[in-house]
Amino acid sequence: MRLVFAIAAALALSAPPVLAQALERGEVWSLKLGAPIADQPIDFVDHACGSAGGPPSIPLGGWADFKRCRPEESGLREVYFRYDDEREYVARAHHSPAEVERYGGTKTYGFPIVVSALISEDAIVRGLRIVSDPRYDANRDEAYVLKNFITARLGRDNWACEDLPMEEGETAVDGVYIKQRCARSLDGGTRATMWVRHLRKAGQARFDPRSGKQTKNQFESLVRLDLVQP
């Protein structure tokens, strides 16, 4: 797959030591589950109330404003954030295309994502949420492949996966139809739940029925991961 090969090629390129050191930054995996908000990374920006992968809502001044966000059914409050783009600017100044690609935008394993922390009433980060970001056209049709990288990180074994029923009007994308929910327990009782979708919804088609021209982005391809402590 194009994106997988591109990621592998990017990882094979190493930045000059000085640049690599300068570009170290936090990402979603840097969140410390079970730790208070005061101990979380400070190099994230644009905190806001999250919407499960949708656009951010109420702007926040930082982690400390989390109680302005409405609690979910679990009682946790979702706080959206994005990665600081300073590292991207440094990479551009050093004329390092591989590092620009690596540090451009909020990504994991090369996939654009929407990320958030799930915070309890006592200001402890109890979980994280990662959702594919559909706003980026490049390789959007391969967003579902992120599942493979997540299972490699968390462990490929002991996932209980359920194929969800096809709803009326849903169809495959170039012969591929995925609508799945997977879950597993990690050390310490942390629960990982992942939803994977790659399909066309009712009304979406590869070709416009009136003009016969190929449509653009008329499909859904995404991964959502919730990683939550008990």
Show which residues each predicted segment covers.
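Long, compositionally biased
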Residues: 67-84
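Positively charged n-region of N-terminal signal peptides that target proteins for export
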Residues: 1-4
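Leucine-enriched alpha-helical scaffold segments used for protein-protein interaction
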Residues: 6-8
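N-terminal signal peptide c-region/cleavage motif recognized by signal peptidases
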Residues: 15-17
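Non-cytosolic coordination micro-motifs
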Residues: 21-68, 86-114, 121-230
